[in-house]
């Protein structure tokens, strides 16, 4: 019976999808073990290390449907690792004496690590697809809302004007950096593990590296320069990438949650009848995808910390740290795909309300562009004096609930240097966007 949201019948397609779950399933992992054993047999048979007939027979029986999972569970509980249980069944499935050549010169971790690498590669293909879709959809929003002026916020308060396109362009630029990181990461992760007991391949005498090369070619992996049984930087780096990627998605979801607040109401998740509704408050439209994203990404970040712990291993084969990866990797990959899936859903139907953004720009009576006035006065009064003057008038605007323009035009220190037309122009949010449009163009042109 499922106990985790990753495989719960109710929650599994919220926090992941069927494709990623299949990759990390018992059946697929075991098939990867069998793929490894078949590839090893082919490589060793081609080099004359085991008989050709044995290589062919081992390959013939390396199918997951031949595995008795009840027996495998029983042996794994007793041994502590599933690979030997698979090898025992494999040997018994082979005809004649072929079974005695199974797993020749290998060790459990060689099989497990290589299978994990192949699972990660397949997982990264899914992640890359979702990531590219998110970039495409976010770019559409950048272009559409390039000039949609809104309040930029600092410490949750209105700061200076930006455009929604600018906000989304920053998101696109970050996603593109993650795409670049993923492309750079894949060659470092896609490496075979095959070193035997302590990494030296001593059991294969002078043919160890030849077998290693052929095995890597058979599995579509890179040959390692040296064994990495207790050097876990590859796995940790993969985990850190997932943590960074999902951290970016959580930042995006957090912004959407805040923009959905009743008092703000500038952006909303896609509408679907009853989605995000409350059991007691009929008016509610909760940011449900954003909630799933922020919850899942928190879990992923904790998993990354565990993967970093797993780097601290003893000697050439470790006592316990390695098993952390077994626990963590399936769920962090599933939850990463889940967050990407929810992000794509958001981007496909995100509701943007320019009129509400424009309304919110005016709620401070012009204070959102007070910096523009200060900078216009600074060359005349000096920056500090200009700051103090505008600060005083902003405070007065708040106290008396008066438009800033009215107070500025009543202040001699302002009118001595700025005309009414200049003050009015300075207080137009659309005139204080700086290099917004140039930066948007640069963000979109990044290859």
UniProtKB/Swiss-Prot annotation:
- Name the Pfam families for this protein: ADSL_C (PF10397), Lyase_1 (PF00206)
Instruction: Please classify the protein's predominant subcellular localization into one broad category.
Output: cytoplasm
**SMART domains cross-referenced by the UniProt entry:** ADSL_C
CDD domains reported in the protein's UniProt record: pCLME (cd01597)
GO CC annotation terms, alphabetical:
cytosol; nucleus
* Keywords annotated in UniProt: Cytoplasm, Nucleus
**GO molecular function (one):** carbon-nitrogen lyase activity
Annotated localization: Cytoplasm; Nucleus
Family of this protein: Belongs to the class-II fumarase/aspartase family.
Record's protein name? Uncharacterized protein C8E4.05c
């Amino acid at each position: 019976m499922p106990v985790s949201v990753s495989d719960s019948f109710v929650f599994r397609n919220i926090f992941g999808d069927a494709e990623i779950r299949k990759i990390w399933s018992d059946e697929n992992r075991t098939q990867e073990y069998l793929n490894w054993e078949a590839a090893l047999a082919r490589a060793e048979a081609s080099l004359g290390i085991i008989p050709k007939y044995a290589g062919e027979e081992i390959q013939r029986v390396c199918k997951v449907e031949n595995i008795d999972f009840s027996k495998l569970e029983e042996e794994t509980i007793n041994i502590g690792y599933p690979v030997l249980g698979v090898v025992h069944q494999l040997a018994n499935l082979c005809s004649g004496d072929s079974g005695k050549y199974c797993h020749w010169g290998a060790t459990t971790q060689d099989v497990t690590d290589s299978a994990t690498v192949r699972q990660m590669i397949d997982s990264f293909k899914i992640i890359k697809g979702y990531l590219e879709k998110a970039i495409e959809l976010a770019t559409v929003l950048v272009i559409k809302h390039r000039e949609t002026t809104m309040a930029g916020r600092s410490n949750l308060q209105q700061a200076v004007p930006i455009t929604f396109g600018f906000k989304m362009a920053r998101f696109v630029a970050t996603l593109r950096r993650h795409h670049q990181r993923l492309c750079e990461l894949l060659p470092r992760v896609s490496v075979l593990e095959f070193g035997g007991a302590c990494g030296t391949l001593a059991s294969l005498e002078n043919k160890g590296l030849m077998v290693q090369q052929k095995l890597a070619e058979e599995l579509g992996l890179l040959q390692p320069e040296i064994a990495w049984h207790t050097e876990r930087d590859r796995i940790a780096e993969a985990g850190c990438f997932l943590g960074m990627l999902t951290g970016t998605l959580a930042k995006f979801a957090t912004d959407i949650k805040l923009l959905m607040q009743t008092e703000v109401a500038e952006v909303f998740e896609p509408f679907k009848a009853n989605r995000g509704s409350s059991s007691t408050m009929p008016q509610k439209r909760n940011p449900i995808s954003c909630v799933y994203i922020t919850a899942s990404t928190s879990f992923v970040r904790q998993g990354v910390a565990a993967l970093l712990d797993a780097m601290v291993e003893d000697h050439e084969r470790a006592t316990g740290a390695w098993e952390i990866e077994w626990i963590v990797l399936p769920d962090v990959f599933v939850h990463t795909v889940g967050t990407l899936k929810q992000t794509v859903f958001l981007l496909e139907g995100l509701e943007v309300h320019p009129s509400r953004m424009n309304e919110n720009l005016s709620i401070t009576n012009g204070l959102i562009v007070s910096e523009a006035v200060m900078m216009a006065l600074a060359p005349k009064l000096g920056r500090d004096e200009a700051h103090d003057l505008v600060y005083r008038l902003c405070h007065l605007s708040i106290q008396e609930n008066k438009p800033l323009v009215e107070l500025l035009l009543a202040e001699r220190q302002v009118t001595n240097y700025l005309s009414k037309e200049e003050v009015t122009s300075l207080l137009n949010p659309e005139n204080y966007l700086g290099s917004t449009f140039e930066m948007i163009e640069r963000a979109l042109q990044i290859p």
